[in-house]
């Protein structure tokens, strides 16, 4: 594909999408004027701020506005979809737009979709560690996961469109995402802040059941770097990154048991004087939903184990510590973010910070 190119980014006001937008604005091809970015944004006020202060184009719409989403997708070379992995209608509309473009021009749209290893969970409820680790150098096990599972319907749509050939699709499957975001609005992740809020509310760190189940983690900046690795490969003539039936990309760098994470949260919050004890306790089954919300057995008590393969083959170089050190060391900053965002006077808009970071 010849430059310049046009990108449609969804989720720009969110944690992952906002960090992706910040990284796009730092790229040399963007600074050189070779990239046009259009963001799908819900809400006139947010859209206006992003357009005026960051200088990117916006389309104001909800993901449910299929006609608007379809048209926006039909006009771009690249779709980077981070907004919602469980909204197949919008994924379908984007693919329909890409198909219209292909039928008109013969050009494939590059489609990078942010899914998640929530699709690979079990129902352990913290009771055991499953030895199964999903791999991505052969995606047969991933493809075998039913499309009724979380994320899988949208993933399957993109895979089939990639096989058909009108998009060059990549389904990136991050595990728990940690770290501080760099976008214009939401800068906190989901799972660790939720566990911190629960610990503050219950005055003790908690885990689902015995907490023996195992998950993985990845820093948000390392995740975003994989998006751009795939993008650059797709834009190049070499195109080494597999797509089609092998379009799934895992990106785990950290491994932890839920009880280990809970113990680390308890230790660090107790050291700050935020909770009266460092000891973590198991939640009883009847306590889980009240403590952590719906689907908590899966989000905080399942096994979801994966190993990055193809990303490393392409030259992915995560910058944050692997094992569990990077993940555990992020807890202090996640705690600070939870406290900051809980204050009425806390800044909810980070566009000035983004501009300072960009030197503008």
What are these regions (language model features)?
Residues 2-31:
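N-terminal Rossmann NAD(P)H-binding glycine-rich loop of SDR-like oxidoreductase domains
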Residues 194-221, 226-230, 241-242:
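A conserved pocket-lining segment of Rossmann-fold NAD(P)-dependent short-chain dehydrogenase/reductase
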Residues 179-193, 230-248:
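Glycine/proline-rich active-site loop of Rossmann-fold NAD(P)-dependent oxidoreductases
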Residues 240-241, 248-307:
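Terminal hydrophobic/aromatic helix or amphipathic segment near a protein terminus
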Residues 155-183, 193:
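Conserved beta-loop-beta element that borders a ligand/cofactor-binding pocket
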Residues 10, 96-156, 170, 180:
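Conserved Rossmann-fold NAD(P)-dependent oxidoreductase catalytic core, especially the SDR/UDP-sugar
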Residues 41-105:
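NAD(P)H-binding glycine-rich loop region in Rossmannoid oxidoreductase-like domains
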Residues 321-360:
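Amphipathic terminal alpha-helices
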């Amino acid at each position: 594909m010849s430059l310049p190119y046009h990108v449609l980014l969804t989720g720009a006001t969110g944690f992952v999408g906002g960090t992706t937008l910040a990284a796009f604005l730092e790229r040399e091809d963007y600074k050189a004027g070779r990239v046009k970015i259009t963001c799908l944004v819900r809400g006139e006020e947010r859209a206006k701020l992003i357009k005026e202060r960051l200088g990117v184009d916006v389309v104001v719409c909800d993901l449910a506005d299929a006609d608007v989403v379809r048209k926006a997708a039909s006009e771009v070379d690249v779709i980077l979809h981070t907004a919602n992995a469980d909204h197949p209608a919008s994924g379908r509309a984007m693919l329909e737009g890409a198909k219209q473009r292909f039928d008109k021009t013969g050009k494939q749209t590059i489609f990078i979709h942010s899914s998640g290893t929530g699709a690979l969970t079990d129902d352990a409820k913290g009771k055991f560690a499953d030895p199964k680790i999903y791999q991505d150098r052969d995606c047969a096990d991933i493809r075998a996961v039913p499309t009724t599972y979380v994320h899988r319907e949208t993933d399957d749509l993109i895979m089939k469109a990639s096989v058909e050939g009108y998009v060059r699709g990549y389904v990136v499957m991050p595990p728990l995402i940690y770290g501080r975001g760099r976008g214009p609005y939401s800068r906190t992740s989901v799972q660790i802040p939720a566990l911190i809020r629960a610990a503050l509310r219950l005055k003790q760190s908690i885990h689902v059941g015995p907490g023996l189940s195992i998950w993985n983690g990845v820093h948000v900046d390392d995740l975003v770097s994989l998006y751009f690795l795939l993008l650059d490969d797709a834009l190049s003539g070499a195109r080494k990154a597999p797509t089609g039936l092998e379009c799934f990309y895992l990106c785990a760098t950290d491994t932890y048991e839920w009880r280990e994470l809970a113990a680390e949260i308890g230790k660090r919050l107790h050291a700050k004087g935020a909770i009266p004890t460092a000891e973590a306790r198991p939640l009883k089954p009847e306590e889980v939903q009240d403590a952590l919300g719906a689907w908590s057995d899966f989000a905080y008590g399942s096994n979801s184990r994966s190993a990055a393969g193809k990303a490393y083959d392409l030259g992915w170089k995560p910058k944050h510590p692997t094992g569990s050190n990077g993940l555990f060391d992020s807890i202090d900053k996640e705690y600070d973010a939870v406290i900051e965002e809980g204050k009425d006077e806390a800044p909810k808009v980070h566009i000035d910070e983004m501009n300072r970071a960009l030197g503008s």
